[in-house]
Amino acid sequence: MTRSLKKNPFVANHLLKKIDKLNTKAEKEIIVTWSRASTIIPTMIGHTIAIHNGKEHLPIYITDSMVGHKLGEFAPTLNFRGHAKSDNRSRR
């Protein structure tokens, strides 16, 4: 189910404060966050946000096409390395 239109998009308060502070200073620096559930809003465009994937922080540059999506969508948590090869030779 999608979020009700009566509600505003969720953005963590600490993340919103950091974005607003950087926008008033007109500075660009990497913002480190663990908040994967936060929605990308238009004030975040142009910033680089390092999103935690469970192991490390991945820096993601926010563009206008990302608005409305969640931060966690751009930092995958699992690495699929492919299916196991047929190893009949090693079993003999």
Swiss-Prot record:
GO terms for molecular function: rRNA binding; structural constituent of ribosome. It is found in: Plastid, Chloroplast. It holds the Pfam family Ribosomal_S19. InterPro entries: Ribosomal_uS19 (IPR002222), Ribosomal_uS19_bac-type (IPR005732), Ribosomal_uS19_CS (IPR020934), Ribosomal_uS19_SF (IPR023575). SUPFAM superfamilies: Ribosomal protein S19. Its main location: plastid. GO terms for biological process: translation. One of its GO terms (cellular component) is chloroplast. Signal peptide: none annotated. NCBIfam families: rpsS_bact (TIGR01050). PANTHER family: RIBOSOMAL PROTEIN S19P FAMILY MEMBER, SMALL RIBOSOMAL SUBUNIT PROTEIN US19M. This is Small ribosomal subunit protein uS19c. It comes from Nicotiana tabacum (Common tobacco). The lineage of its organism: Eukaryota, Viridiplantae, Streptophyta, Embryophyta, Tracheophyta.
